[in-house]
C-alpha cells in the first residue's frame, strides 16, 4: 500500500524531528512525521525543560537565542507551556565567582542581557536557596522553561491546528528508507505500508537498530544515561525559572570556552565523587510546584547501549540529594518519582549529520542541548536540505 507523496518525511517524533517538520511547514512544504512509539517517550520528555542558550558556545548559542524567539512566538498563538522566568547560575565559592564574572564579560561584548546578583539579591529572588551556598550569581532574564512532559504534545497539537499540510502518525516505526527515483521511499510494517517523499530527515534519538545500524555502529556516537528526580508539589517553595549551580559552571561549554580561568581552577575535594558520575545539580520548579532535581551522566558507546541498563543507582541518587540539600532549604527527599533518561551525543561533534544523498538526511546525537538548540538549528538544517 502506497500513500500520498510528501515534500518531506520526518522520521522521529522528538524535539529535533518536530522542529524540522515545523520549519518545513513554515516554508510551505507538505510534511509527514512518523514516530515509532505511542507518543514521544525519549529524551524530549525526560529532561528539565530548561532552554538555556547561556550554556552554549559559538553557533549553538545563536541557535539557542533563535530558539527563544521561536518558542515565545508559538506561545503567543498556542499554550505550549513556555514560562519566561530566566536562568540563574549560582556560584558557591571564589572560583565559581570568577567564572561567572568572566562569562558576564563575554556576554556583555555580545549584548546578551545578563545581570550579576549578590547574595542578598539571590536570597530575595530565590528564598529557597541557602545563604551559606549562595556567594554570587549570574542571571539571564530572557531565558525560558517549558514543561517537558507537556511541551512536545502541545507543539504537535499546535502544528496540526495551524498547518493543513501536516500529518503526524504515532505507532509507526520506520524499518526501511531508500532512494526511489528523484525522491525517497519509507517503509513500515515490513514494507506493507509505504510513503514517498521528496526528501527524508531522520532524527532517531537513541534508536540505532531500525535504520542504518552499520552506519551508526561506526559513527563514534555514545549514549548518556542520566538520573533525575521529582519532588511532591511544594507550593510554599519559590524557585522560579532555571536554577543552575556551581557544578554547572564547572561543566557547561560556555564556561569552558569563554572563561579564561576555566582550565586552571581546581576541583574541590567534596566535588570529586560528584564529578566521577557526571553530576551537576539543577532545579526546575514545574507548573504544579513539584521540583525536578538532577542530574548525573554515565556513558556507553552506541554498540553497547544496553550495558547502561534500565536500573537506577541508589548511590548516584544519594549523591545528588546530598548536594541538593547543601544548596536549598526544603526537604529534597520528599520525592514522588525518579527516572533515567538517555540521549546520544558525540565526543567531538556537536551533532552527527549524514547526507546519504540529496534526498536522505540524518540529524542525530544533538546531546543534552536538544531543548535549547533544536528550534534554531532545525531552521538552518531545513534551509540546507531544501537548497
Over which residues does each language-model region extend?
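Glycine-rich FAD pyrophosphate-binding loop
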Residues: 26-45
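Active-site substrate-recognition segment that forms the wall
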Residues: 22-23, 51, 81-82, 204-332
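Dinucleotide-binding Rossmann-like beta1-alpha1 core, especially the glycine-rich loop
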Residues: 48-125
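Helical element adjacent to the flavin cofactor pocket in flavoenzyme catalytic cores
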Residues: 139-187, 195, 199
Amino acid at each position: 500500500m502506497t500513500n500520498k507523496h510528501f515534500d518531506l518525511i520526518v522520521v522521529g517524533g522528538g524535539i529535533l524531528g518536530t522542529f524540522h517538520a515545523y520549519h518545513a511547514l513554515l516554508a510551505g512544504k507538505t510534511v509527514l512525521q512518523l514516530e515509532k512509539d505511542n507518543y514521544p517517550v525519549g529524551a524530549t520528555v525526560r529532561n528539565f525543560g530548561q532552554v538555556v542558550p547561556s550554556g552554549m558556545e559559538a553557533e549553538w548559542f545563536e541557535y539557542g537565542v533563535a530558539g527563544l524567539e521561536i518558542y515565545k512566538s508559538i506561545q503567543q498563538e498556542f499554550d505550549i507551556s513556555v514560562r519566561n522566568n530566566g536562568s540563574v547560575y549560582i556560584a558557591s565559592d571564589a572560583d565559581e565567582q570568577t567564572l561567572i564574572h568572566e562569562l558576564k564579560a563575554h556576554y556583555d561584548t555580545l549584548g546578551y542581557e545578563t545581570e550579576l546578583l549578590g547574595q542578598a539579591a539571590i536570597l530575595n529572588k530565590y528564598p529557597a536557596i541557602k545563604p551559606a551556598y549562595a556567594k554570587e550569581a549570574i542571571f539571564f532574564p530572557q531565558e525560558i522553561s517549558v514543561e517537558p512532559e507537556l511541551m512536545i504534545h502541545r507543539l504537535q497539537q499546535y502544528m496540526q491546528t495551524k498547518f493543513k499540510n501536516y500529518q503526524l502518525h504515532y505507532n509507526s516505526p520506520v524499518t526501511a528508507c531508500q532512494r526511489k527515483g528523484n525522491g525517497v521511499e519509507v517503509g513500515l510494517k515490513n514494507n506493507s505500508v509505504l510513503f514517498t517523499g521528496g526528501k527524508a530527515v531522520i532524527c532517531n534519538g537513541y534508536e540505532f537498530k531500525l535504520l542504518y545500524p552499520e552506519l551508526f555502529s561506526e559513527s563514534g556516537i555514545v549514549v548518556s544515561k542520566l538520573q533525575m528526580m521529582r519532588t511532591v508539589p511544594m507550593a510554599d517553595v519559590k524557585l522560579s525559572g532555571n536554577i543552575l549551580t556551581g557544578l554547572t559552571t564547572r561543566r557547561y561549554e560556555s564556561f569552558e570556552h569563554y572563561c579564561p580561568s576555566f582550565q586552571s581552577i581546581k576541583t574541590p575535594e567534596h566535588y570529586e565523587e560528584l564529578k566521577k558520575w557526571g553530576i551537576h545539580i539543577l532545579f526546575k520548579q514545574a507548573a504544579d510546584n513539584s521540583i525536578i532535581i538532577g542530574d548525573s551522566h554515565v556513558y556507553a558507546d552506541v554498540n553497547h547501549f544496553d550495558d547502561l541498563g534500565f536500573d537506577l543507582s541508589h548511590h548516584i541518587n544519594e549523591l545528588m540529594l546530598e548536594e541538593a540539600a547543601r544548596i536549598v532549604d526544603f526537604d529534597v527527599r520528599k520525592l514522588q518519582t525518579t527516572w533515567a533518561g538517555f540521549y546520544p551525543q558525540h565526543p567531538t561533534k556537536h551533532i552527527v549529520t549524514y547526507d546519504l544523498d540529496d534526498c536522505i538526511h540524518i540529524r542525530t546525537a544533538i546531546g543534552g542541548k536538544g531543548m535549547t538548540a533544536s528550534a534554531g538549528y532545525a531552521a538552518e538544517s531545513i534551509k540546507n536540505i531544501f537548497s
